[in-house]
Design a protein with these regions (language model features):
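Short active-site loop/helix that positions an aromatic residue
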Residues: 61, 170-171
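Residue-level recognition of conserved beta-strand positions in structured domain cores
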Residues: 34, 146-149, 180
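Metal-dependent nuclease catalytic regions and adjoining charged, substrate-binding loops involved
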Residues: 172-257
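A generic structural signal for short coil/turn motifs at secondary-structure boundaries
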Residues: 40-42, 152-156, 188
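Metal-dependent nuclease catalytic cores that hydrolyze phosphodiester bonds in DNA/RNA
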Residues: 1-135, 247, 255
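Non-catalytic protein-protein interaction segments used by genome-maintenance enzymes to assemble
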Residues: 123-164, 171
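Glutamine-centric residue-chemistry signal
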Residues: 118, 164-166
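Flexible, glycine- and charge-enriched loops at secondary-structure boundaries
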Residues: 45, 154-158, 193-196, 200
Length: 257
């Protein structure tokens, strides 16, 4: 590739489940995020999840089950201020309540010895050019649990979530489960063998589709933009206003060439 042609991805690119999902749902949004580096700011849901998962980890590691919640509440408030989350103060109470549910779910299943928390793992996968990067929430001796904080509890696990944990189960060679919680309700689901096999194969196909797309563009950012319509409809992605404006300018500039 010529030195004056900006690549779509760098040589050290690594697959991730979120990257592939973004590409499948909206290739132009994927280009903005990974090719152009236009990243959306942290939102309220991300803040809630970060605080709830950290709170759960802390409570279990410190053996705080059933103890006075005042110290725990202060811990969450301190972390909120330390990380300088913006416009999400109301998520502090939600995160505290959700963490209590997460902790209860894990304790009821005798899951108390956390082997790792938010551990990064990078693995080569047969049939893929690029390795796969993974982050687990809670890893126990014989189970990986992915925590999902939400304000509306799903009646059944979301397909994307099952697909991701199917991928992780195969690559970690360990059973996986999904743990959902709102401030008032919770849901725990252990993946079946069929979930794992189907989820892994679907995720693998998404990775391969992305690699074929990169080949088709000759790893050229400009070529990728030329063959990919810019789709900024609120669904399936809520676009940040500044990113939307910047993306529109870039697409118009490339299309005029």
């Amino acid at each position: 590739m010529s030195a004056n042609i900006k690549p779509l991805i760098k040589e050290d690119f690594k697959h991730s489940f979120s990257s592939a999902s973004k590409f499948v749902k909206n290739p132009s949004e994927w280009i903005c995020h990974y090719g152009l580096g236009l990243r959306s700011p942290s939102n309220a849901a991300m803040t809630r999840g970060n605080l709830a998962e950290f709170g759960t980890y802390y409570k279990i590691k410190r053996g705080m089950n059933g103890k006075d919640g005042k110290a725990f509440s202060k811990l969450i408030e301190h972390r909120f201020k330390k990380l300088k989350f913006l416009n999400a103060d109301n998520e502090i109470k939600n995160a505290i309540d959700i963490a209590v549910h997460f902790e209860k779910i894990l304790y009821e299943r005798q899951l108390r010895d956390i082997k790792s928390y938010q551990r990064e793992e990078i693995k080569k996968v047969e049939g893929l050019k690029y390795p796969v990067r993974m982050f687990t929430d809670f890893e126990f001796e014989n189970l990986i649990v992915d925590a999902k904080s939400t304000l509306r509890l799903p009646s059944t696990p979301k397909i994307d979530h099952i697909r991701q944990q199917g991928l992780y189960s195969k690559l970690y060679e360990k059973p996986t489960a999904l743990m959902y919680a709102t401030p008032k309700k919770s849901l725990f689901y252990e993946l079946t063998d069929d979930d794992v096999n189907i989820g892994f194969n679907e995720a693998l196909n998404h990775f391969k589709s992305l690699e074929n797309y990169i080949i088709r563009c000759n790893n050229s950012l400009e070529e990728a933009i030329k063959i990919t319509p810019l789709y900024t409809d609120p669904n399936p992605f809520a676009w940040d206003h500044n990113i939307k404006q910047e993306a529109e300018k870039i697409w118009q500039k490339v299309m005029k060439k």
